[in-house]
């Protein structure tokens, strides 16, 4: 598959295979096209050439580097309730607490939370969806050390496949069983 913009490839063609247990780290310095690869895999950008296909039974969850909340003038409880209307308030509070969003943090407007707290809410929402593939673009952005450790602990317990873009080698090397280096 070739990736790029406006019909121009930004990388040489890439190719890799995964199975249901692959935890793949897309490794490379900033600006080489790792996010572009993920966006192309997710069909948010067209491939310049070739294609990437998933098994028909794939259930994919994707967290982008740039967080997108439809309405940032709601709190975490409301966001989760709108995203998962069948979840009880108690279950929402329990799930938010697991990612460190407790008490008053759960009722503050998302726009008033730190970047790390917003990441935690997105991760909490992501973890509620049934999936067998996680695609994560810099999931540790804005997280403190304890939150990073909790995230990677949860990812290690995840039984599906993972495609990870991260500049956190300490965590990525422990988590991933396959590395794909992006180089020019």
Question: What are these regions, as identified by a protein language model?
Answer:
Residues 1-184:
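ABC ATP-binding cassette signature C-motif
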């Amino acid at each position: 598959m070739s990736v790029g913009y406006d019909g121009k490839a930004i990388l040489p063609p890439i190719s890799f295979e995964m199975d249901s247990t692959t935890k793949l780290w897309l490794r490379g310095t900033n600006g080489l096209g790792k996010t572009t690869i993920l966006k192309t895999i997710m069909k948010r950008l067209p491939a310049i050439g070739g294609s990437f296909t998933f098994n028909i039974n794939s259930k994919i969850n994707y967290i982008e580097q740039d967080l997108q909340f439809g309405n940032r003038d709601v709190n975490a409880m409301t966001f989760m309730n709108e995203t998962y209307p069948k979840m009880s308030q108690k279950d929402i509070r329990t799930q938010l607490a697991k990612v460190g969003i407790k008490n008053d943090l759960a009722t503050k407007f998302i726009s008033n939370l730190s970047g790390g707290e917003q990441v935690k809410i997105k991760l909490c929402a992501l973890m509620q969806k049934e999936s067998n593939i996680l695609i994560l673009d810099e999931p540790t952005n804005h997280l403190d050390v304890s939150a990073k450790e909790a995230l990677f602990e949860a990812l290690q317990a995840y039984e599906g496949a993972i495609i990870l873009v991260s500049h956190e080698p300490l965590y990525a090397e422990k988590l991933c069983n396959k590395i794909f280096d992006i180089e020019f």
